[in-house]
Structure formats: C-alpha cells, structure tokens
Amino acid sequence: MLTKDVKEAVACDEEAQIERVKDFLCSYRMCAQMLQLRRYERKKRVLSEEYEWETDLLGGGEAYWRARMLEVRSLIESMRNGREKLMLYYHYIRGESIEHAADLLGFSRRTGYRVHSRALFAVSFLYERRRKNRE
C-alpha cells in the first residue's frame, strides 16, 4: 500500500503532466493567430507599397508555427475515437468553449467539463510517451 507522501507526489506529478499537455494544446490557437497576424501584416504592407522582404515584422516563425500546429493536431488524432477526442478537437483545434463544444456534442456543460478533464488525462500519457521517444 502506498504511503500518503507517495500518493501526494504522484498526484502532483500527474497535475504537472496535465498542465504541460494543456499548454501544448493551447499553443495551436496561438500559432494560428500568429499566422493570421503574419498574413495581415504582409497584406497591409503590400497594399501600402512599403513592403520590404528583408524586414518582416515576424520573420522566420511561420515554419515553426505550422509544425507546432501539425504536432497538436496529430496528437489529438492519435487518440481513440470517442467523446474525449471530439472534445479536444472542438475546444483546442476549432477554438470552441467547453460549454459550446459540449452543446455541439449533445451533452450537458457539467458532462462537458468531465469529458474534458478525462481527455486531458488520457492525452497527457500520449504526450509524455511522444516526448520520451524524442529524447
């Protein structure tokens, strides 16, 4: 039987793991917004004829942002089909709130939050496995 200290340490580790994966999943929307900002800046400068290719406002990050978005999408797609996978897709890829995603999936808000937390727990193991395979 595990002691109280060991149980607390395991719980803290799981919480940290879930926070890491949550930050990783949230990066999808940030990268999408950065790409959108990049397109807007490019369009604005081309239209005003002040565009200089050497002085891009956000130079060099596009490849990274696209790769990061692809990583997030592939992590979610690697999950088994089910409510958890759909919840993560609607919330992190499509940018819907948890409440609206639950509505779209046909269950209550409370169930939506439960499914979301279960999904984060499940995907955190996939994320950690991928991270360890890269090292």
Cite the ranges covered by each PLM segment.
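N-terminal interaction/assembly modules
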Residues: 1-78, 99-100, 124-135
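Short, conserved sequence motifs enriched in acidic/basic residues, glycine, and aromatics
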Residues: 78-79, 106
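Short amphipathic alpha helix immediately N-terminal
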Residues: 79-96
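Secondary-structure boundary/capping signal
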Residues: 83-84, 109, 131
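Helix-turn-helix DNA-binding module
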Residues: 94-110
